[in-house]
């Protein structure tokens, strides 16, 4: 049996988990502890890196102890320590990776530095036993990407955002409308009573031959609409949220439908092609329904891990560690690994800089 302790501190969740795998049996999440920092950041309308790092320092040792206790294991039972080493907020990454190094050194265990995005990319194999290859749509506060997942450590980025991540667009929209943080669930809640036809917002990149995403123009359109009808009433806010959400769903549908067609052409022999959606934005019911419909039309299986494993967690980091151990891909120099605020899964893909574009989102 392989048991790995995972640690995740890349943003505003302090998390630790123990995941086990025995032979050909399904993997087991023995513990999965996540401490959210929403209350600490709510007053600022977004994550403050310094506050996040200090909160990780205060909480991580207790979270690791709780994960071990809940799993019924001790460090002697653990085969390796896996920790997120990037991408993310560098202060939080330092806290998590240095803690993992200390634990691994003291216990005499291997240290596996894990790419946070790889954790998301491999979660469907933890929850659904999915076989390679498959298509991944990663939609979170920091990333919006489409990747072909061909194997452990083998990823092809087919699309990314050329400006804002989708989760960031949700958060900024919420802030403009006076909705509390986090923006995603509050925009979705307000949209439930809104008229999605009242405002005609742009569908960024729709119809473009370029495969990438863009959300800055949509965010600007929301601000202009809100400014034009100030002061905003509750129904105005609901209508803007519903119209914004509809525009996002349409834009995603256009980008993802192209990716599904490309996947079918690139991997024609795949028996059960699948689209996996991961990241916090994957919790949005309108977006999920849109993607499920697309998959049904294209003959793809739609896979969305449970919400607690879609958002940031340490079980996915522990599982990525297990996957790498099984493939003999654990770093020989894990203790020398330094945190990376930007760390693309597909190192071959060109950075999205130039031609009027802002810097790459990992």
Curated annotation (Swiss-Prot):
Coiled coil: none
HAMAP family: TsaD
Subcellular compartments: Cytoplasm
Gene Ontology cellular-component terms listed: cytoplasm
Catalytic reaction annotation: L-threonylcarbamoyladenylate + adenosine(37) in tRNA = N(6)-L-threonylcarbamoyladenosine(37) in tRNA + AMP + H(+)
Organism: Mesorhizobium japonicum (strain LMG 29417 / CECT 9101 / MAFF 303099) (Mesorhizobium loti (strain MAFF 303099))
Name of the gene encoding the protein in the UniProt record: tsaD
PANTHER family in alphabetical order: TRNA N6-ADENOSINE THREONYLCARBAMOYLTRANSFERASE, TRNA N6-ADENOSINE THREONYLCARBAMOYLTRANSFERASE, MITOCHONDRIAL
Name of the protein in its database record: tRNA N6-adenosine threonylcarbamoyltransferase
Entry note: cofactor: Binds 1 Fe(2+) ion per subunit.
EC top class named in words: transferase
């Amino acid at each position: 049996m392989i048991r790995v302790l995972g640690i995740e501190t890349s943003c505003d969740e302090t998390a630790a988990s123990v995941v086990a795998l025995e032979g050909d049996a399904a993997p087991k999440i023995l513990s999965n502890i996540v401490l959210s920092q929403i209350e600490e950041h709510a007053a600022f309308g977004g994550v403050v890196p310094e506050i996040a790092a200090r909160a990780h320092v205060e909480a991580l040792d207790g979270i690791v102890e709780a994960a071990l206790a809940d799993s019924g294991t001790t460090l002697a039972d653990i085969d390796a320590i896996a920790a997120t080493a990037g991408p993310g907020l560098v202060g939080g990454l330092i806290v998590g990776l240095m803690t993992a190094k200390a634990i691994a050194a003291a216990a005499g265990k291997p240290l596996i530095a894990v790419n946070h995005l790889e954790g998301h990319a491999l979660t469907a194999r933890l929850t659904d036993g999915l076989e390679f290859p498959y298509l991944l749509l990663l939609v979170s506060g920091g990333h919006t990407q489409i990747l072909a997942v061909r194997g452990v450590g083998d990823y092809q980025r087919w699309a990314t955002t050329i400006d804002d991540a989708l989760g960031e667009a949700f958060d900024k929209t919420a802030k403009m409308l006076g909705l509390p943080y986090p923006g995603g669930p509050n925009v979705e809640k307000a949209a439930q009573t809104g008229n999605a036809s009242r405002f005609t917002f742009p569908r960024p990149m729709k119809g473009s031959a370029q495969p990438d995403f863009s959300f800055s123009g949509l965010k600007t359109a929301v601000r202009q609409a809100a400014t034009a009808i100030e002061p905003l009433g509750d129904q105005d806010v609901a209508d803007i949220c519903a119209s914004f959400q509809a525009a996002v769903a349409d834009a995603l549908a256009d980008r993802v439908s192209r990716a599904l067609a490309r996947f079918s052409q690139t991997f024609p022999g795949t028996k059960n092609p699948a689209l996996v959606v991961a990241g916090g934005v994957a919790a949005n019911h309108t977006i999920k329904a849109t993607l499920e419909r697309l998959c049904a039309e294209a003959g793809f299986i739609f896979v969305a891990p449970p919400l607690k494993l879609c958002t940031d967690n340490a079980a996915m980091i522990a599982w990525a560690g297990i996957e790498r151990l099984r493939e003999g891909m654990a770093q020989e120099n894990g203790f020398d690994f330094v945190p990376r605020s930007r760390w693309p899964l597909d190192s071959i893909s060109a950075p999205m800089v130039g031609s009027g574009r802002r810097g790459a989102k990992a």
